[in-house]
Design a protein with these regions (language model features):
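Membrane-embedded alpha-helical segments and the immediately adjacent membrane-proximal loops
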Residues: 1-223
Length: 223
């Protein structure tokens, strides 16, 4: 029993750390794309002489901004790949965990309600009451950090628009447009191909537990 509890704890820590790492990368990516500016002072600045003679492309007047945007796109692709890999690993195990936690919340709430109607020892009641928050905390942990990834992903398009794109060249704007189109698609972790780790899912699980509890309580009352 102790080994199973420790294994579950280590698994939770492992997945939470990975989710935090992805959320942190998205936060850093938001800051990076919003900070991109043209070092040359805008598209109307003087073009170097070599550009006029044809030795340098005129659109490369601010190459650092373009290169920075290409780096942002590459970094974004790595984050997308990481989310897909993490989703693949969490798909079945976390779905089963959330489902069992929903059942455990229902059962513990039902047993606590029944015990309150009877004369039981305080230690028994304490065990039931103290166990219930553990399942709620574990479920909320995954959903809250999953929501963090969603929130950071939704910021990407706004951060891109907040960059210094008006003062950058055409190549930069094209890459930025492609990035914004891709960033408009939601970044989220889905388990069991039906549950997205988010605040809404957490509320759904609690609502499911309450529905089951209400059904069991009505059956118990009819006896």
């Amino acid at each position: 029993m102790v080994v199973a509890v420790e294994a579950s704890l280590y698994l939770d820590v492992f997945f939470v750390v990975l989710m935090l790492a992805i959320a942190g990368e998205l936060h850093a990516l938001n800051d990076a794309v919003a900070a991109i500016r043209s070092p040359a002072g805008g598209p109307g600045h003087a073009v170097p002489a070599r550009a006029a003679t044809g030795t340098v492309d005129a659109t490369s007047a601010a190459p650092s901004a373009y290169k920075a945007m290409v780096g942002v796109v590459s970094r974004h692709q790595l984050i997308l790949a990481s989310i897909r890999e993490l989703e693949l690993v969490m798909n079945h195990s976390i779905f089963l965990l959330l489902f069992l936690n929903m059942l455990n919340i229902c059962v513990h709430t039902f047993v606590t309600a029944v015990l309150l109607q009877k004369e039981v020892q305080p230690t028994t009641m304490y065990k039931m009451v103290s166990t219930l928050p553990i399942y709620m905390y574990e479920t909320g942990l995954y959903c809250i950090f999953g929501q963090t990834i969603i929130d950071q992903g939704e910021r990407l398009a706004t951060s891109a628009f907040s960059s210094g794109w008006p003062e950058c060249g055409v190549r930069f704007r094209r890459v930025l447009l492609v990035f914004m189109l891709r960033a408009s698609q939601p970044l989220q972790l889905t388990v069991g191909q039906m549950y997205t780790l988010s605040r809404h899912t957490f509320l759904q699980l609690l609502n499911g537990s309450y529905t089951l509890f209400n059904m069991l309580y009505q059956i118990q009352g009819n006896k």
